[in-house]
Amino acid sequence: MEEDDQVLHLPNPMTGFGVPNNPCVSSDEEVVAKVGQADLAELHSDEGCTGHSHGEIRRDVERYGGDEPAPHVKKNVLEEIRKWNLVWAGKNKVASLDPDELEFFLGFPKGHTRGICTTNRYVALGNSFEVDTVAYHLLVLKGRYPNGINVLSLFSGIGGAEVALHRLGILLRNVVSVEKSEASKDILRNWWEQTNQQGNLIEVEDVEKVTVERVEQWMSQFGGFDIVIGGSPCNNLAGGNRDSRDGLAGEQSLLFFDYSRILDLVQSI
């Protein structure tokens, strides 16, 4: 194991995969049913920007008294609501979703992102995928790995893939998590501990450090990876970015090509 690999051997005083008040999904049908909810992968809010929108929307609507606003006003109001993920909180009053509500809608455990500042919580959740949607796509793995799974998780973020696998009742034997954000790493590490995971969590801070030698070392140690999974390498590709989205042409977005590089490595060894 190289020096900057951090292996966390955490105590597991409890039996099973979860904690008493947070059981795993009991059936395949439950996961599929929950996936029918709206796609909330782009939920994100910025308190500094939405304050202005709140006031504008209220003034625009109240200008018409009790009458129906003009079509162009209704269009502008709805655009602002969609843009900033606002909800109606009373007559002519809109409000931002708070981080706890975002966690709920995205399918993360309650308090998943607690412990970091509010702004960072919004950023982390805005760059995340909807957990139950991820679980739906991973459902096929449930019966294939009754003894647990080895995961190479690239651009892990706050652990959406790990949470989804756990929710399906799949034991996480070994997880190599590649993530640069310290805040996101803290969130995943805390979740790993709180859910009493029985396996090993190995943290790597830079995807460019995932070399042939290290992949060979991990595969020799674990007996291979069962799945390589990855999120968006930066907000340039995420729904939370409303300003500059250059796709794979973005400077940091080029890191996405490391995903295919690493996948080829795993398949060739």
Q: What do the predicted segments below correspond to?
A:
Residues M1-I269:
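Conserved active-site and SAM-binding loop architecture
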